[in-house]
């Protein structure tokens, strides 16, 4: 189970009727496209990749140039995943690696629950179309909205590397795939 935490007070977030709510009543609405914005930032505006960049990357990856690499990442993730796993894709973008990993986990006869985190709302809109089963959050890899020691595996492919945060969220014996 994905254990999200409030970016304001670090309390556990509970999903309720279109929003996430913590014990101190901080509330975060779930967007129509399925993601929740847990990025705390005083400046409004655009964060992460814009629509043009996301489309360009998606179009490039959809042509198959990285298929062998994506398959290798997915196979490695499935190999180290326990039978019931929570996988965090830190910097998930459009969810290409996330979806491949979940498929590989299922093919291996295991069950995985995936949390995708990215700073780009646009990227998460595309990720939600790839698979509505992902839990998706707008957040920074430097401040993951995840409870300590709650993740079996962290994927960090072509995204900011924040080892302290990854160590914080990984369960003892968990894996970082980078």
Task: Name what the model sees in each region.
Residues 142-153:
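A short acidic, Gly/Pro-enriched loop at the edge of an enzyme's catalytic core
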Residues 132-143:
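Conserved SAM-binding strand-loop segment of SAM-dependent methyltransferases
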Residues 48-72, 76:
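Class I SAM-dependent methyltransferase Rossmann-like catalytic core
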Residues 84-93:
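Conserved class I S-adenosyl-L-methionine
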Residues 94-109:
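Conserved SAM-binding loop of SAM-dependent methyltransferases across substrates and taxa
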Residues 120:
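Conserved SAM/SAH-binding beta-strand->alpha-helix loop
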Residues 163-175:
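A short glycine-rich, Lys/Arg-flanked "PGG" loop and its adjoining helix->strand segment in the class I
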Residues 1-47:
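N-terminal auxiliary segments of SAM/dcSAM-dependent transferases
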């Amino acid at each position: 189970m994905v254990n999200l935490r409030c970016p304001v007070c670090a309390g556990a977030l509970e999903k309720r009727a279109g929003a996430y709510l913590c014990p101190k009543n901080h509330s975060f609405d779930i967007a129509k496209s399925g993601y929740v914005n847990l990025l705390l930032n005083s400046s409004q505006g655009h964060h992460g990749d814009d629509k043009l960049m996301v489309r360009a990357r998606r179009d490039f990856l959809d042509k198959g140039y990285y298929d062998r690499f994506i398959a290798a990442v997915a196979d490695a993730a499935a190999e180290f995943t326990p039978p019931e796993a929570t996988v965090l894709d830190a910097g998930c973008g459009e969810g290409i690696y996330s979806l491949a990993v979940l498929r590989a986990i299922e093919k291996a006869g295991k069950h995985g629950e995936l949390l995708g985190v990215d700073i780009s709302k646009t990227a998460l809109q595309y990720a939600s179309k790839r698979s509505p089963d992902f839990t998706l959050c707008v957040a920074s890899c430097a401040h993951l909205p995840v409870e300590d020691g709650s993740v079996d595996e962290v994927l960090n492919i072509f995204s900011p590397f924040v080892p302290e945060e990854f160590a914080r969220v990984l369960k003892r014996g968990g894996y970082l795939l980078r």
